Amino acid sequence: MTGSIRSKLSAIDVRQLGTVDYRTAWQLQRELADARVAGGADTLLLLEHPAVYTAGRRTETHERPIDGTPVVDTDRGGKITWHGPGQLVGYPIIGLAEPLDVVNYVRRLEESLIQVCADLGLHAGRVDGRSGVWLPGRPARKVAAIGVRVSRATTLHGFALNCDCDLAAFTAIVPCGISDAAVTSLSAELGRTVTVDEVRATVAAAVCAALDGVLPVGDRVPSHAVPSPL
């Protein structure tokens, strides 16, 4: 998995945004994807959302909020998750090189966030059969979720890194459809407040490095993580 996964050589346009409504950001992604297909730049959006539940194409009825809380149904992969204040969301709008390798792309996103955790002193990694970034334990704890879509060789949607968000928001759903694992945050793991602003620049640099092959993908599986199929 060395070398760039991108079809363009020019630098990724990193846009550090503030708090953006989910539907507004989704429309911006589509516009940037259209521009990328027409020959425009690769873009990385980094932002926060107001509190919202979003459901991927594989979400089942019993995984939705039991109290009837509204959910935005999306065209990304994966199942239901929560976005909100204290969570850094990243949307890479990237033209992928041929031959397309979506698994490779997801692994690079994971690697970038694993590196961010390492820079903060956390030994994170992967759990076999499950996307995202995990901390070891019984159960394993997910600190970052990933759900993507690739259309016309261009990526949409992306990742969400829990910094200092309210983890209680995840209790109303079955996060990512996984009932035998937990959700955590950088702040909960480190015992101090880790804000979104603290990690913005580090995340941007790591994602760009991973997509360009400067940060190689390693075989990082936390010890004591319990793999099980989706």
Swiss-Prot record:
Belongs to the LipB family. Its EC number is 2.3.1.181. Monomer. The lineage of its organism: Bacteria, Bacillati, Actinomycetota, Actinomycetes, Mycobacteriales. The gene is lipB. CDD domains: LipB (cd16444). It comes from Mycobacterium tuberculosis (strain ATCC 25618 / H37Rv). This is Octanoyltransferase. One of its GO terms (cellular component) is plasma membrane. The record marks 142 as: Lowers pKa of active site Cys.
